[in-house]
Amino acid sequence: DRKYMKVLIAPDKFKGTISATEVSQSIAEAIDDLHEVTIQPLADGGEGTLEIFGGGNKMSVVSGPLGEPVSASWRLDGKSAVIEMAQASGLHLIQEKCFTNPIDASTFGTGELIRTALERGAEDILVGLGGSASTDGGLGALQAMRPLKRYSSIEINVACDVQTGFIECAGIFGPQKGATDTQIRFLENRLRRLA
């Protein structure tokens, strides 16, 4: 005798293998039809954040992590925008080329997306911070957004799942971006000067 249940399926992605939506659908398929299933994929601010908000409905060509042009998807609904840093400044954009460059990688393209969202009328911008190739502390993004006074009347929020200190980011995330011990020390010093 089986009991009826309400089931909420709310996973994040399995990084590098399957999206949160695909995980949700796979779990739902395995659950008995006798139960009421609600699917609500989640994201941690990294890759997949844009998908959770309905996917991109805009495409912009911006600077990739090493300055090369990349097509980056983002979302604009009315006056609200969602930008996923990984779309413009993502580590996967460099890894596809089989090399990394943790010193020169920049968030400039993410700033270009933020600037574009502002120019298209966004007043509330959410930026998902995960999956970047850069340890520039957001300096590249700020340079692309100039003049910064244009942003004084809008709200920009960030989504991330870590509480790592600003300077400690180099030591924690530098290795996954290909940084050597010497490069990590350089990145920490650069972040310290920026702070």
Task: State what each model feature region is.
Residues Y4-A195:
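N-terminal loops that bind phosphate or other acidic moieties
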